[in-house]
């Protein structure tokens, strides 16, 4: 496309869109009435419960239900008469006033008490800053199948309310509309399985799959919110352009830009705690996409036939459209054109956005992070070359310079999937744990174990996929998990190597972590026998908790001996596994642990000497 024609098209479509999909608030006297009517009472209540649970993570379900009931009754009255008292107040004002009026708020949430002295929007910003990514809450344990089904059948609404509350307060940035979708799926599973002859056999695999989906969704949304907060809307919009260009390669750049702008607004609203607006605008975006399928994708119809929640989620996960068969070589517009520097100088964001769009739609097999790194490399090359006497001679081989950037994640995927296939998930997690403990031994052992277990699941998520889907799956998943590592590390920074990777560009973060060497500045921990002393209770732990106990011991061994070889660690952990198996078979298990434990510790010290 000729550049002048393209700029004109973008200007016209952009101007039209500025009056577009989401510009509706002025027509409503009452924002809360508007959202209540749009969403319906069921979803309105769910989102209000979720909002309060995200902000007040220590409150009980019963306390939140009382707040939800009061807000819903108020919204219902405003829907009947939008000019009624206080109905014209903003949602931030209404919700903030409700939080600050709670009895004993200052005692229970002393760290947030100062927020209530502020005015909007500073008050809401203050509440957001106090969301805790790692709240000190007990692990959420699933009830036995019979007890679960009894509670669900006695009061399905209360049962699902508890589910929303518990997920929300543990994941204060979870994407609100998606949590409602998962709650609906949860309800469907319980309805089906509680009528089955073997409730447990029906429930366990289905609920395990939903839990895994929720955990992955939580870290992915947290990455989006981190990106938005740290680098602003422009960075997120670039992510959205790349992602949507891959999914909708037949849509033109103006359409992709429009969709990316909308998605950025929706994501910003959810990250900002504006869940009612976020859910409402997400539904509006889905409506727009379904009304404009012809200009977006041929794969949308099945999604568009679904009801609101399912429709939006289906569109978010829709398969890639078929790539156009006649796409010209990219070099024509971005390398060979004599006006490359002129076009870049006249409209940098548009020119780079077009490059990202064109490159992304041709490479659905790349991760979004990789595509953004390539765009960053292209931008840096133009910045350098367009200032030189012969720009084309300078940037003429820029596409050749992309090769090492592409090969690095491809090699990462190949080597890690081969290791996963050889070791299985648990063995692969252990390999990752050793690798990252050596890179950042100062990080707390629980954080290292959590990170390694999450990073290790990348094999299960991605390595069985077709080759063309592996790279985007692996790198985008790793980026989300490493973002959580960074968030936890920011609270108590202990490793300069981790700080270096976490403080840089988001798209460079995964390569930075992958390239980290063993931390040679680390002074090994003193060997303490009590760290490796176990008791009979380990024998009755669920398999997951037993694995975590063993992984904790493994991390501590590496911290004691960072230079330990793979063979040394394998020998020690093999002896440890035999020790557990032997003692857990004994009638007097504790006596076995007391007798054999010190021997194991002595042998381990000797093996690592």
Swiss-Prot record:
Positions of post-translational Phosphothreonine modification: 445, 447
InterPro entries: ALB/AFP/VDB, Serum_albumin-like, Serum_albumin/AFP/Afamin, Serum_albumin_CS, Serum_albumin_N
Superkingdom field: Eukaryota
Signal sequence coordinates: 1-18
Residues at which Ca(2+) 2 binds: 38, 280
SUPFAM superfamilies: Serum albumin-like
Protein name: Albumin
Organism from which the protein derives: Meriones unguiculatus (Mongolian jird)
Lineage: Eukaryota, Metazoa, Chordata, Craniata, Vertebrata
Gene from which the chain derives: ALB
């Amino acid at each position: 496309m000729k550049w002048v024609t393209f700029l004109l098209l973008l200007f016209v479509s952009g101007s039209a869109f500025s009056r577009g999909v989401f510009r509706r608030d002025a027509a409503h006297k009452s924002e809360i009435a508007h959202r209540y009517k749009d969403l319906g009472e069921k979803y309105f209540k769910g989102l209000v419960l979720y909002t309060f649970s995200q902000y007040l993570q220590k409150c009980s379900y019963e306390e939140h239900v009382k707040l939800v009931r009061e807000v819903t009754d108020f919204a219902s009255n405003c829907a009947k008469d939008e000019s009624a008292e206080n109905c014209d107040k903003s949602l931030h004002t209404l919700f903030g006033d409700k939080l600050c009026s709670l009895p004993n708020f200052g005692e229970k949430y002393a760290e947030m008490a100062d927020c209530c002295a502020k005015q909007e929007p500073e008050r809401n910003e203050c509440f957001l800053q106090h969301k805790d990514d790692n709240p000190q809450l007990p692990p959420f344990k699933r009830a036995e199948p019979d007890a679960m089904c009894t509670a669900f059948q006695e009061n399905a609404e209360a049962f699902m309310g508890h589910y929303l509350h518990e997920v929300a307060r543990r994941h204060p940035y979870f994407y609100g509309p998606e949590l409602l979708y998962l709650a609906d799926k949860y309800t469907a599973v319980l309805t089906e399985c509680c009528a089955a002859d073997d409730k447990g056999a029906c429930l366990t695999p289905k609920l395990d799959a939903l839990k895994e989906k929720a955990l992955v969704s939580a870290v992915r949304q947290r990455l989006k919110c981190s990106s938005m907060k740290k680098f602003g809307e422009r960075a997120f919009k670039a992510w959205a352009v790349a992602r949507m260009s891959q999914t909708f390669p037949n849509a033109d750049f103006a359409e992709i830009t429009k969709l990316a702008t909308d998605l950025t607004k929706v994501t910003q609203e959810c990250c900002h705690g504006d869940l009612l607006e976020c859910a409402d605008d997400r539904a509006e975006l889905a409506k727009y996409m379904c009304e404009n399928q012809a200009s977006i994708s041929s794969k949308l119809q099945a999604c568009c036939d679904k009801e609101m929640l399912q429709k939006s989620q289906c569109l978010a996960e829709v398969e890639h459209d078929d790539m156009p068969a006649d796409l010209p070589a990219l070099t024509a517009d971005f390398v060979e054109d004599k006006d490359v520097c002129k076009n870049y100088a006249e409209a940098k964001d548009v020119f780079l956005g077009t490059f990202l769009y064109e490159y992304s739609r041709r490479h659905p097999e790349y991760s979004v992070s990789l595509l953004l790194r390539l765009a960053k490399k292209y931008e840096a090359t133009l910045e350098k070359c367009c200032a030189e006497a012969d720009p084309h001679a300078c940037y003429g081989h820029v596409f050749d310079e992309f090769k090492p950037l592409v090969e690095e994640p491809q090699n990462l995927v190949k080597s890690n999937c081969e290791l996963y296939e050889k070791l299985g998930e648990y063995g692969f997690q252990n390999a990752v744990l050793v690798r990252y403990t050596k890179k950042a031994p100062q990080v707390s052992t629980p954080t290292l174990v959590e990170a390694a277990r999450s990073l290790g699941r990348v094999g299960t998520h991605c390595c069985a996929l077709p080759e063309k889907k592996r790279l985007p799956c692996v790198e985008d998943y790793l980026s989300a998990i490493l973002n959580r590592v960074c968030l936890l590390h920011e609270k108590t920074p202990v490793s300069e190597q981790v700080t270096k990777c976490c403080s840089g560009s988001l798209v460079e973060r995964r390569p930075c972590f992958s390239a980290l060497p063993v931390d040679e500045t680390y002074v090994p921990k003193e060997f303490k026998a009590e760290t490796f002393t176990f008791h009979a209770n380990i024998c009755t732990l669920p398999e997951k908790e037993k694995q975590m106990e063993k992984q904790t011991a493994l991390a501590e061994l590496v911290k004691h001996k960072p230079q330990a070889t793979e063979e040394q660690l394998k020998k020690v952990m093999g002896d440890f596994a035999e020790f557990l198996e032997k003692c857990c078979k004994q009638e007097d298990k504790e006596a076995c642990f007391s007798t054999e434990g010190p021997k194991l510790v002595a042998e381990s010290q000797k093996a690592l000497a």
